[in-house]
Amino acid sequence: AAVVDGATDRTRQIADEVLLEVAPGDAVFEFIRRCVDAPSSWRAATSRRPWSGGGADRALAAMLPLIGRILEAGQRAGTVRPDIVPSDLVVTLMSVRAIGDLCDADAPGTSRRFLEFALDGLRPGHRTPDQPPMSVKQLGRVLTDR
């Protein structure tokens, strides 16, 4: 629980800083970059083990509204696709972590390159996928392996 609580607090701090310091059109992209740069934030947030015992529900309840505010600001500014939802941003962080774990030891920077491709996919001008976004309930199950 302490790992999840610490990661949640750090991610909340990043979100608050981004909301105060960053122009709305850049907020989503800066939030994700800062989370990736703070391993205590995104590593715990994308590992299953720490999320047991209700940690996922508490953390998601605390974080998704803040992520939603950042996302809505970018969507209002026209820099983020209107079909993106908060869980898409969490999945983006999970994806960057997976690439980092698989590739960065042998090819440093691969996850950063992938991150930039992923961020470009959040921008307007792309077709809405046929698949629906992951729901909060599904995200909770993924994080806790239940």
Language-model regions, residue ranges each:
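Amphipathic alpha-helical packing segments from all-alpha helical-bundle domains
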Residues: 6, 30, 51-102, 109, ...
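Short linear capping/connector segments at secondary-structure termini
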Residues: 45-54, 134
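Alpha-helical DNA-contacting segments of helix-turn-helix folds
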Residues: 1-7
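Secondary-structure edge/capping motif, primarily at the C-terminal ends of alpha-helices
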Residues: 18, 46-50, 100
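C-terminal peripheral helix-coil segments that are non-catalytic and often amphipathic
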Residues: 64-77, 102-146
